[in-house]
């Protein structure tokens, strides 16, 4: 049986200014992470009005996480959408984080390719928080640690 890697990151940050987040901050964090990752990992987006056109798709970290290629089904004349191989757990974040306060959220990465790129993923989270999150793009200084957990 092949091992299928799943890891959970705990991302703790301290607010450098007051941060106002929506009730569930997952979409906000996903957007900040996506922008940071694209600016680091995609060589084609700056030439294509922000659209990643990296080829082959299988080698592009941004495309693998945010726009996984569809897989052909061998027995049928169809293609299957592939779910993005990461999950953001932001349910523990408050809507208001005051300057100086710390907050924590989690991200889970799934699959071999994402695990080969853990350093890039961590750096993208650092950049996303440094660029700012929330309504006013308030900045936070990031600290992240890898917390692997076994499959059930």
Regions found by a protein language model. Give the residues of each.
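RNA-interacting cores
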Residues: 1-152
């Amino acid at each position: 049986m092949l091992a299928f890697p799943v890891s959970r990151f705990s991302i703790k940050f301290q607010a450098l200014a007051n941060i106002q987040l929506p009730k569930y901050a997952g979409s906000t964090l996903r957007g900040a992470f996506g922008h940071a990752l694209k600016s680091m990992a995609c060589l084609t987006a700056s030439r294509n009005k922000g659209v990643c056109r990296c080829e082959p798709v299988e080698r592009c970290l941004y495309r693998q996480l945010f726009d996984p290629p569809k897989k052909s089904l061998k027995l049928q004349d169809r293609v299957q959408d592939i779910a993005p191989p990461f999950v953001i757990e932001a349910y523990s974040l408050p809507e208001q984080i005051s300057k100086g306060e710390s907050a924590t959220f989690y991200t889970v990465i799934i699959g071999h390719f994402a695990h080969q790129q853990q350093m890039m993923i961590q750096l993208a989270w650092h950049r996303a928080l440094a660029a700012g999150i929330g309504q006013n793009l308030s900045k936070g200084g990031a600290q992240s640690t890898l917390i692997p957990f076994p499959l059930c």
